[in-house]
C-alpha cells in the first residue's frame, strides 16, 4: 500500500530521519523529518499551469505549530489553533529565504510549502528539521530547484563551536546562529550574539556550512533512492530584438535617472522612461504575457545600468563611493510625554523610536510549544505606506515588519541590563517615517538611543548597518549603507549590528551562488568601519543613560521573608489593596519574597515601602514602641496594645504600674497611646509587653522616712 523510503543520518549529537511515501501522498512531495522527539511533516504542492498575467514567482511558505505536538490543548474560548504566532511567522521566513533564490528566473508556477510540527522535544527546536524537510520535499517534487539546501544551528560555548545545540546548551552559548546554503555556497544567515568579534562570527558561518554537508549529502542520497519524476521545464528564451528596442527607447533616460540623487525625482524620471516604452511597445492588442515580458526587460535594463556603473568605479546612485555612510542626524527627547524617544535619520531613511518602561505585570506572556515564559523586552517595527510616499493598507503587521522587528530586537538584547539591576519591562516601537534602504538598522540605532533617553543603563551603544554586493564574474563591489534600489538590484543584503567591541546580530540574504569567504570577510570589515563611524556620532549625541522621565514609573525593590507574604497580601488581598489605594502605587510580589513597588513619585514609593516594612517587621525584645490600646481584656487580665500594623501584644495587669493595679480601666482606655517595652516573644509569636518597665520605680518607704 505504501511505497515508503527512509533515510537516517547523524547530525551533530542528533539522529535525523527522513521519511516519504506514507503520509500526504497526494501532495507533489511530502517528507517527515524526525530529530530526536521533534517531528515535522513538510508537504510541497505545485501548480503545473502558470496563471494568466503572472509576472513574479508565487512561493508561499507556512510553518505551523500544533499544540498537540507538546501534549497541550490550546487556550482561549475556541480551543483550536488560530492565527500564526510570531515564532511561526519568523520560521516561515527562515525557510523561505534560502529557498527562493534557487528557483530559476522566469519560473512563475505556484509553489506552496507547508511545514507542520506534529511532535516536539522541548530541547530540540523544530526550525532546523523544518528547513531540512522543505529542502528534501522540493527535491522530491521534481520542480526546477537548484538544491538541496542544508541548514544548521551553531552555538559558541567556551570558545568552541557547537553544532545544533540543545535549548539547555543555547542558554550557556554566546551565539545563536542559523546558516543555510547549498553544497557550494552560503545563502542565508540569521543570528544573535553576545558581542563577539567579526572573525568568530565568520568562523561560525563557515563551520555551519561545512557541517551541513552531511544533511545535503543525505538528501541527495534520499532523492536518488526515491528517484522522483523531474519537471520538463525550460526557461523562456530572451527576445534579443525586443531587448534592443527597449534599450533604444529608454536606455539613455534610465542612465540619466540614476544620476539623480533624490529618490522621488529619480523615480519620476524612471516613470518617464517606462511611459515612453509603454507608449511605443504596448497597445490594447498586446496580451498580458507580452506586456510582462517588456516590463521584465525594462527592470533588467535598470539593474544593468546601476550594476555596471558601480563595477566600473563610478559613483553610486546618490553620488557616494562604496564605503561612505549617508549623512546622519540624531535627536533625542523629541516627544515630551513619552518615557524616551529618538529621531534617527540616515540619508532618506528615518526612524522615530519610542521607549516605554513598565512593571513586571507588563511583560509579554508567550505560550510556546516548549512551555510558557515571559519576555521583559519587546521591539515592534512599523512600516506605514507613507514612508515610501505610497498609498497603501494600514493594519496588522506584515511578515516583513515582524521579521525586521525581531532582527532589531536581537541586536539590542546583548546590551540590556540584568533584571536584578533594572527591573523594568521595556518596549521600543520603531515607526519608519521615511525609507530608502535599511530601515531595520535605523531601528537598531533609534531603539538604542530611545532606551538611553528613557534612562535604561545599557552596557554599550549599538548601531547597525546594511551592506550590499554586486558581483559579475571576477569583479565585485561591496557597498556600505545600501539604498533601496541597490538592495533590489544587488546580489546580497548583509546586515550587521554591534558595539565598538563586537557583533550582536548578523543577517545575510544572498541571491546568487558564488560568494566566497573572502568577500564575506571584506563585507564584515567594511561594516565594522561604518558601524564605528555611526557609534561615534550616537555617543556624541547621547553619551549614556539619561535621567528617568518624570512620566515613567519609579520602581522600588525590597525583599521580605517568604513567610510574611500572606501578611502583606492580607485576607482576600485586603491589606495589599489598601496599601495600593492609599499610596497610589502598584505592587507585585514574587514567590521568593521580592516585592516591586511601582509609583509615579518618590514619596508614594517610600510610603508604600514603609507600610510593607511595618507589616513585615518583627517585634524585637528589649525595644521600646509607641503603641495604641486596642482592647481591654475581660476578667481584668490586662490590655492588648498594637505596636505596629498587624502586631499586637499583651500588657498584663502586673506590667501596667509599679503599684498594685486593681482595675485595668483605671489606667488604660481603648485608643490611648502608650509607650511599651517588649519583654518576650514566645515560640508561637505571642508578644509580652510592659508599661511598668519604662516607669521610674517609687522610692522605698524607709528611704522616704529618713
UniProtKB/Swiss-Prot annotation:
Residues where Mg(2+) binds: 487, 493
Presence of keyword NAD: no
Disulfide cysteine pairs (residue numbers): none
Residue ranges occupied by any S1 motif domain in the UniProt entry: 622-692
Subcellular location: Cytoplasm
Keyword terms of this UniProt record: Cytoplasm, Magnesium, Metal-binding, Nucleotidyltransferase, RNA-binding, Transferase
InterPro entries from the UniProt entry: ExoRNase_PH_dom1, ExoRNase_PH_dom2, ExoRNase_PH_dom2_sf, KH_dom, KH_dom_type_1, KH_dom_type_1_sf, NA-bd_OB-fold, PNPase
CDD domains according to UniProt: KH-I_PNPase, RNase_PH_PNPase_1, RNase_PH_PNPase_2, S1_PNPase
Cofactor: Mg(2+)
Residues annotated as signal peptide: none
Keyword Transferase part of the UniProt annotation: yes
One example GO MF annotation: magnesium ion binding
GO biological process, alphabetically ordered: mRNA catabolic process; RNA processing
Stretches assigned to the KH domain: 553-612
Catalytic activity: RNA(n+1) + phosphate = RNA(n) + a ribonucleoside 5'-diphosphate
Pfam short name (any one): KH_1
Gene3D superfamilies: GHMP Kinase, N-terminal domain (3.30.230.70), K Homology domain, type 1 (3.30.1370.10), Nucleic acid-binding proteins (2.40.50.140)
EC number(s) stated in the UniProt entry for this protein: 2.7.7.8
Homology family: Belongs to the polyribonucleotide nucleotidyltransferase family.
Protein name from the UniProt record: Polyribonucleotide nucleotidyltransferase
Species this chain originates from: Neisseria meningitidis serogroup C (strain 053442)
Gene name in the database record: pnp
Amino acid at each position: 500500500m505504501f511505497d515508503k523510503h527512509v533515510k537516517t543520518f547523524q547530525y551533530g549529537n542528533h539522529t535525523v530521519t527522513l521519511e516519504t511515501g506514507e503520509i500526504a501522498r497526494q501532495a507533489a512531495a511530502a517528507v517527515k523529518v524526525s530529530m530526536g522527539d521533534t517531528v515535522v511533516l513538510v508537504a510541497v504542492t505545485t501548480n503545473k499551469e502558470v496563471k494568466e498575467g503572472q509576472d513574479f514567482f508565487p512561493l508561499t511558505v507556512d510553518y505551523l505549530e500544533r499544540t498537540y505536538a507538546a501534549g497541550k490543548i490550546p487556550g482561549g474560548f475556541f480551543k483550536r489553533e488560530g492565527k500564526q504566532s510570531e515564532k511561526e511567522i519568523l520560521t516561515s521566513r527562515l525557510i523561505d529565504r534560502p529557498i527562493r533564490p534557487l528557483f530559476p528566473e522566469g519560473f512563475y508556477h505556484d509553489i506552496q510549502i507547508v511545514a507542520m510540527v506534529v511532535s516536539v522535544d522541548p530541547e530540540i527546536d523544530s526550525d532546523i528539521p523544518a528547513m531540512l524537510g522543505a529542502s528534501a520535499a522540493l527535491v522530491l517534487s521534481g520542480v526546477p530547484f537548484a538544491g538541496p539546501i542544508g541548514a544548521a544551528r551553531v552555538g559558541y560555548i567556551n570558545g568552541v563551536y557547537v553544532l545544533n545545540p540543545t535549548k539547555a546548551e543555547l542558554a550557556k552559548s554566546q551565539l545563536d546562529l542559523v546558516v543555510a546554503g547549498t553544497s557550494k555556497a552560503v545563502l542565508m544567515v540569521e543570528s544573535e550574539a553576545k558581542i563577539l568579534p567579526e572573525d568568530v562570527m565568520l568562523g561560525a558561518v563557515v563551520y555551519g556550512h561545512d557541517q551541513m554537508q552531511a544533511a545535503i549529502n543525505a538528501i541527495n542520497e534520499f532523492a536518488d533512492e526515491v528517484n522522483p519524476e523531474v519537471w520538463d521545464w525550460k526557461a523562456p528564451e530572451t527576445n534579443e530584438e525586443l531587448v534592443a528596442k527597449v534599450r533604444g527607447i529608454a536606455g539613455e533616460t534610465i542612465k540619466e535617472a540614476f544620476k539623480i540623487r533624490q529618490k522621488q525625482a529619480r523615480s519620476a524620471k524612471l516613470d518617464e522612461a517606462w511611459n515612453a516604452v509603454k507608449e511605443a511597445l504596448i497597445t490594447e492588442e498586446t496580451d498580458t504575457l507580452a506586456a510582462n515580458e517588456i516590463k521584465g526587460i525594462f527592470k533588467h535594463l535598470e539593474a544593468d545600468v546601476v550594476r555596471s556603473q558601480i563595477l566600473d568605479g563610478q559613483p553610486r546612485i546618490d553620488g557616494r563611493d562604496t564605503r561612505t555612510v549617508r549623512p546622519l542626524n540624531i535627536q533625542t527627547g523629541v516627544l515630551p510625554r513619552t518615557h524616551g524617544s529618538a529621531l534617527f535619520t540616515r540619508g532618506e531613511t528615518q526612524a522615530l523610536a519610542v521607549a516605554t518602561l513598565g512593571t513586571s505585570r507588563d511583560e509579554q506572556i508567550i505560550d510556546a510549544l516548549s512551555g510558557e515564559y515571559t519576555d521583559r523586552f519587546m521591539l515592534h517595527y512599523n512600516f506605514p505606506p507613507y514612508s515610501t510616499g505610497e498609498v497603501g493598507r494600514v493594519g496588522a503587521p506584515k511578515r516583513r515588519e515582524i521579521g525586521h522587528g525581531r532582527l532589531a530586537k536581537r541586536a539590542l538584547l546583548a546590551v540590556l541590563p540584568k533584571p536584578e539591576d533594572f527591573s523594568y519591562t521595556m518596549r521600543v516601537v520603531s515607526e519608519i517615517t521615511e525609507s530608502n534602504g535599511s530601515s531595520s538598522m535605523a531601528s537598531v540605532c533609534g531603539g538604542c538611543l530611545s532606551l538611553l533617553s528613557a534612562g535604561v543603563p545599557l552596557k554599550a551603544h549599538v548601531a547597525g548597518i546594511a551592506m550590499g554586493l554586486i558581483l559579475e564574474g571576477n569583479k565585485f563591489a561591496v557597498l556600505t549603507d545600501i539604498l533601496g534600489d541597490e538592495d533590489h538590484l544587488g546580489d546580497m543584503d548583509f546586515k550587521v549590528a554591534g558595539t565598538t567591541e563586537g557583533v550582536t546580530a548578523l543577517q545575510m540574504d544572498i541571491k546568487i551562488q558564488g560568494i566566497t569567504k573572502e568577500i564575506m570577510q571584506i563585507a564584515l570589515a567594511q561594516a565594522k568601519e561604518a558601524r564605528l563611524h555611526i557609534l561615534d556620532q550616537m555617543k556624541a549625541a547621547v553619551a549614556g543613560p539619561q535621567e528617568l522621565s518624570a512620566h515613567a514609573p519609579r520602581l522600588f525593590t525590597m525583599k521580605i521573608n517568604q513567610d510574611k507574604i500572606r501578611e502583606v497580601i492580607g485576607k482576600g488581598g485586603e491589606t495589599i489593596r489598601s496599601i495600593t489605594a492609599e499610596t497610589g502605587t502598584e505592587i507585585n510580589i514574587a514567590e521568593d519574597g521580592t516585592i516591586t513597588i511601582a509609583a509615579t513619585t518618590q514619596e508614594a514609593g517610600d510610603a508604600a515601602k514603609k507600610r510593607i516594612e511595618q507589616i513585615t517587621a518583627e517585634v524585637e525584645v528589649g525595644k521600646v514602641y509607641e503603641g495604641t490600646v486596642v482592647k481591654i481584656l475581660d476578667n481584668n487580665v490586662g490590655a492588648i496594645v498594637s505596636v505596629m500594623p498587624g502586631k499586637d501584644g499583651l500588657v498584663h495587669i502586673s506590667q501596667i504600674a509599679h503599684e498594685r493595679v486593681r482595675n485595668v480601666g483605671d489606667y488604660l482606655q481603648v485608643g490611648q497611646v502608650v509607650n511599651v517595652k517588649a519583654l518576650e516573644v514566645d515560640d508561637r509569636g505571642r508578644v509580652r509587653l510592659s508599661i511598668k518597665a519604662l516607669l521610674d520605680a517609687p522610692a522605698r518607704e524607709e528611704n522616704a522616712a529618713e
